[in-house]
Amino acid sequence: MDEESLQTALRTYDAQLQQVELALGAGLDPSELADLRQLQGDLKELIELTEASLVSIRKSKLLAALDGERPVQEDAEPLAFQNAIVETAEVPVAPGAELETVPSRETGPGPTEPGQEEDDGEDEEGGAALSGRKVNAPYYSAWGTLEYHNAMVVGTEEADDGSPGVRVLYLYPTHKSLKPCPFFLEGKCRFQENCRFSHGQVVSVDELRPFQDPDLSSLQAGSACLAKRQDGLWYPARITDVDSGYYTVKFDSLLLKEAVVEGDSILPPLRTDPAGSSDSDGSDADDPSYARVVEPGAANPGTCSSAFAGWEVHTRGIGSRLLAKMGYEFGKGLGRRADGRVEPVHAVVLPRGKSLDQCAEILQKRTRAGQAGVSKPPKCRSRGSGPGGRPPPRSVFDFLNEKLKGGAPGAPEVGAAPPGRSGKEVYHASRSTKRALSLRLLQTEEKIEQTQRAIRGIQEALARNAGRHSVTTTQLQEKLAGAQRQLGQLRAQEAGLQREQRKADTHKKMTEF
């Protein structure tokens, strides 16, 4: 929204607020008064937000007007800046100056030359003139990436290689090591080189670039950006919504929550230069701060026989997203030249609790069995199960169990248990039946507890609605009656299961020794 629409909306909200205040003074019903007070609070909050948006728009227009007053100076500023630095850094030294230094000190103070005083004055004036000037300075991160940040000159110093340089403080720090130390400029920092904040960085004059004002016109919903948080650092984020000069951003880090920031707390990404820059004459291809772009026909992508990221149906799918963030194009090979492997690495699930030697033996056995193509022979029957096998040894307890269960002492009848079934197998069968009874009994008890909780909730609701709504009370009474019937059925089912369980225990005690 522009300034005029915000002013119109502000006048409308003021008129509505006056009408609401008049209605409050008219003496209405208590129910209507509560709604009017709520509406009054909402209108006041809306007026405050609209006024804040109007102030933000006016501030941005004022800053744009101040920046547009000197376009000619900005074009000539980089050359003048470099010339001034070179002039202040390259001070002419006479051939015999070094040799004459010691005798002059020994003989005491002598008359100072006017040219020397002028040179010292020019050095001080040049350093003072450069201090506070904004530039675009390089920064090498800990992992070797070159980035250009907007910075401010705080003084002139000689670079490590002896060339003229300046000490700069970065204006938009993205790391804690770039954040300016609050005590450095005042000379009160006690940690000096061990300080975890930045005391400035010495940069060669040849590496400096002109200062670039952040261009917010290209930012829209879905654009990548840098957003400032309360700790003073700028984090990579993505814009999700733009409304009246306010930007809703979602940070790339999952540890940071979504935030709403103004225009002075948001920047375009640092690694993107404007498309129409005057010095982009093909030298960007050799710039180490930019990734090498592979032409569509330059790489020969291999054929992939399996679906890319097909394994992620079993995972959360973070692998393919990380590859896409690092610039990988689906169907091409890995590596900066897209000449790496195309086939994904297939996962092999090994048996749990086995060593690598045992896993290798298992794989070898499977390979041999597959190559031989011979099916495994069926397992032999247990001894005594065939017609010619010896019968298992029988004890007096087996004889008593057969007699008490009604079995014949001789050969088994048709439809009876298969031959060779011992008393231990019969005991295992009864144990599984008992386990099933216990499971059903446990499930029934859980249902009884749930029904009792539901009955208590319905009774509390009836107590709350007593004498208020007859329809609601009737419905709750019907629900209560249904829940009580269900509780009676569940209790009857529980009693039946308990009887069966006691019967099984009694049968086991009486029939097995």
UniProtKB/Swiss-Prot annotation:
UniProt cross-references to InterPro entries, sorted A to Z: G_patch_dom, Znf-CCCH_4, Znf_CCCH, Znf_CCCH_sf
Residues with PTM Phosphoserine: 278, 355
Domain G-patch stretches: 315-361
Domain of life from the UniProt record: Eukaryota
Modified residues (N-acetylmethionine): 1
Main location: nucleus
Subcellular location(s) of the protein: Nucleus
Keyword annotations of the record: Acetylation, DNA-binding, Metal-binding, Nucleus, Phosphoprotein, Repressor, Transcription, Transcription regulation, Zinc, Zinc-finger
Matching Gene3D superfamilies: 2.30.30.1190, 2.30.30.140
GO molecular function: DNA-binding transcription factor activity; DNA-binding transcription repressor activity, RNA polymerase II-specific; RNA polymerase II cis-regulatory region sequence-specific DNA binding; sequence-specific DNA binding; zinc ion binding
Entry's Gene Ontology cellular component terms: nucleoplasm; nucleus; plasma membrane
Positions annotated as zinc finger (C3H1-type): 176-202
Region annotated Disordered, chain positions: 92-131, 267-298, 367-394, 493-513
UniProt cross-references to CDD domains, sorted A to Z: Tudor_ZGPAT
Ranges of Acidic residues composition bias in the record: 115-126
GO biological process: negative regulation of DNA-templated transcription; negative regulation of epidermal growth factor-activated receptor activity
Listed Basic and acidic residues bias regions: 497-513
Biological role: Transcription repressor that specifically binds the 5'-GGAG[GA]A[GA]A-3' consensus sequence. Represses transcription by recruiting the chromatin multiprotein complex NuRD to target promoters. Negatively regulates expression of EGFR, a gene involved in cell proliferation, survival and migration. Its ability to repress genes of the EGFR pathway suggest it may act as a tumor suppressor.
Assembly behavior: Interacts with CHD4/Mi-2; the interaction is direct.
Protein name: Zinc finger CCCH-type with G patch domain-containing protein
Organism of derivation: Ovis aries (Sheep)
Gene name tied to this protein: ZGPAT
